[in-house]
Amino acid sequence: MTRTEAFWDRHNTRMTDPEQARAFAAELASIRTVDTIVNALDEHRAAAGLSKAALARAIGSDPSVVRRLLTATTNNPTLSTVAEVAAALGLKVQLVPMTDAERQELTEPMLGTTHAAETTGAA
């Protein structure tokens, strides 16, 4: 068995545990959301012809804040920073419903343990 196959075997075994599935889905949702937002902000910044330093000046921030937001491989930006950068680019942060496939992959595992506890009277 290759390392990749072993990884996916372990992963699939862990996902049979509702709490592990919930934690994985929550982390996956967080990563995807941050990636989507950061990539969209950087694409709009580039399309507007703004440097990261100019964008930082537009939000009254140190250039390192924008640089870290748009280039860090591990980042968890604050909502207020995202909202300010979005506004400076003529954008607004908005929540939209997930597709059925996204809900099945993310929402259902996250609610699975909570919903089961509520329906059995445990909690």
Where are these regions (language model features)?
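Short basic helix-loop element that most often maps to the first helix and adjoining turn
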Residues: 39-56
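Short amphipathic recognition helices of helix-turn-helix/homeodomain-type DNA-binding modules
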Residues: 96-106
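DNA major-groove recognition helix of helix-turn-helix/homeodomain DNA-binding modules
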Residues: 80-95
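Recognition helix of helix-turn-helix/homeodomain-like DNA-binding domains
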Residues: 60-76
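Residues at secondary-structure transition points
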Residues: 24, 28-36, 50, 72, ...
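Helix-turn-helix DNA-binding elements, focusing on the entry/boundary residues of the two helices
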Residues: 41, 52, 63, 79-82
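N-terminal flexible/basic segments that precede or flank functional cores
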Residues: 1-39, 104-123
